[in-house]
Amino acid sequence: MTTESLTGGPAPQRLVVVGSGIAGLYSALLAADAGAEVVLLTKGALADSNTYYAQGGISAVLDEPAPGDTVAAHIADTLKAGAGHCNEEAVRVLCTEARMDIAGLGRFGVRFDLDDDGDPALGLEAAHSAPRILHAGGDATGAGVAAALIKTVLDFQAAGKIQVIGHAHVTSLSLGGEKGSRVVGANFLHGGRHLGVHGDSVLLATGGAGQLFAQTTNPAVATADGLALAWRVGAAVADLEFFQFHPTCMVLAEDARETEGNSDPLLISEAVRGEGAILLDANGHRFMPDYHADAELAPRDVVSRSIALHLAKLGDPNGHVFLDATVIEQQQGRGFLAKRFPNLSKRTRQAGIDWTTQLVPVAPAAHYWMGGVVTDLYGRTTVPGLLAAGEVACTGVQGANRLASNSLLEGLVFGRRAVEGFLGLSGGSPDAVPLRANSAAGGLAFTHAAGTPPVDQSERTTHATTALSGPLELPVVDLNPIPSNRDLFAPSLARGHDVVPKPVSWEFESLPGPGAREVSFARAGAFSRGALRRLMTAKAGVLRDGVLIREAGVALAAWAGDVLPLNVPDSLDVRVHEDSNLLLAAQLLVHSARERRESLGAHYRSDSVQEPAVVEDFDKRYTMSRKVSLVHD
């Protein structure tokens, strides 16, 4: 992808990128470098993203890999961690093309740590069969990558190649085109005003939704904005029951944990356990070998679930365990932790813990959403003109549980591929692609975006095996297209008072006992973001069962009437929009969790008839879209 690729072609296309994590920054740079007009909207400052907080690194098998490592091994590790639910084609793309995009980062100023011989320093993390984790600044990989990309973006802006608009919260997507079904721009809040921007395509790179839960590694901006934006224009979403909880987030003081923003989480990187740290309970017992043969290096879902089960067994389900990194210092020598993990050493010290001699209290925390907006391998969603990449998207590459350090890599590989799709370099149509049954690992059908004609949202979307029990109804705010004069900005034409957004509605199974609906809602109390996060943690967190999930659904439905008042679309309060997005995301997650009655990967139901296991074939995939019922394929 170079500027020459568009030479002699039509006028430059305009790509509107929403989000400034690794997928958004990298794709914006690539599109601009190829000659496209690029507008980059970021909700806060450019550094406000999950990427900035990423510590462990980026997994990749380089031209000169660690001894014994291969791309095939990376593929196998990813498929195994994904519990047999991965789209194998997407995994092959991810692992095969990784080295290309690592080199691409180098073009934009990213530098990774080197070992004493001047070669890339490769770390080992849980569920990887060989050291293949690139890191920067020791344990500050995300910050290092983000800083370099942001600097280059600002250089591009100074050269007139990218238009950056910070503190621009996108509230809706504009629809236009001949049938009024194509995304033609984005409406956003900026400086106390509603504004809009036209684009030939909009790329959602908005990250995840960790703020759904009381304890999260995500910053305050992670409020499911992209998922909600896509859903409201009819895009299909999938795999929402799979939310990964990182096993080792440092437990803050009680008053800090209750802060709704949870804006400064401290994730204790997977790499610390890769270097030899172990987990102990309050009795000093190393318990992970009791739950999995790989102990602390088991996949994340296994470690998080084991911690939760062990705490419940000890009668302290809301408690914490301890990470013992002192063993690393004993094995590697004094000063190793400070050199290998300088940021963590500083942060734990600021929290009053000397982790070279003391234990660190940790507990699972919401970390990464495997599900998201359904896309093909070039970022195309089921809605024409709408692309998605990174955590907000669902290519199927992460399966039911993400392998450590594959998230930044996903943003790179599929961010670049989304730009290729936008520029028409993918060999297919740059427009939306319908859902169709495709072959995955083991040959079972799965719902995957591919092909060329736009999807008809009036028809039924299918997945393989099981139907949802009722239609999902969510009238979308009808948006007029932004005028086609290609002015960069225009007053937002979204008139929220014309059509009022309403909550998702479906029939829940009856709760035990009379008046259970009212009782459940009474326990939930009045809506607040803190109440929502506590509800989701208690009833749809690491450990789930049918009763808890149904209770969550009832409470969420009751809250929805209060959180979606008439003035939401026109509100100038960002938190009003965020609350609406979080509530929608919570409803979709809970509905998906209810439908998957068996345990799989990060979705653990204690009432499942079988224990979670790595399966050989691609499992049934739950895909939903607005006003669409799911039926047997």
Regions found by a protein language model. Give the residues of each.
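N-terminal Rossmann-like FAD-binding beta1-loop-alpha1 element of flavoenzymes
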Residues: R14-L40
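Short beta-strand to alpha-helix junction loop
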Residues: C86-R99, I133-K151, I165, T216-A224, ...
